[in-house]
Amino acid sequence: MLDIGRVRSALRALDVRPTRAMGQNFLVDSQALAHIVAAGEVDTTPCVVEVGPGLGVLTWELVQRAVHVVAVELDKRLIARLHDEFRDASNLTLVNQDILRTDMVALTGHRPYHVVANLPYAITSPVLRHFLEAPHPPEVMVVLVQREVAQRICAEPGDMSVLAHAMQIRAMPDIVTIVPPESFVPAPAVHSAVLRLRRRPTPLVAPHEEAAVMR
């Protein structure tokens, strides 16, 4: 485990009060971090996009291995801390923006890219769809989500939700590992999972046929 006391102290200093209701959970498990970084294949792509870097725990791992990291954070307090924490990281670009309003072509400069993220539970589905349905989607996405959500996305035909259809049309999903509640501050009420989505070279269904498939 990482130093949970330091994480709590940093949150207090920034007056950030994470809540379970909003799905604000900060990862403090070094083993889970290692799984995310390895699954994200961050050293094989010219650009890695991190969504919600928070206190920079995952960001630190990424800048050690990736060619270029673009970290998108909505909270201005956290962005200010990240600028200070990573002032010497020449391969990191910090962006204070809502990822759901972000143009991925503009963000990545048309480069191939991978996504890694510890996603707030409340915005998991919108963020996944934002990336995979974008004109310039990532080659690989590795996201930390609720275990039940990951299982639904990986469901077999005949037991698939609308979200599972939308994801599997565009990507091949698999669950890398399960992460227990005590790996976070604050601890969520449920287990999480590291979910990997590898983009298909060609979607299984043409865009104009998707509505019929997902009825």
Could you say what each language-model-derived stretch is?
Residues 1-215:
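Catalytic cores of RNA-modifying enzymes
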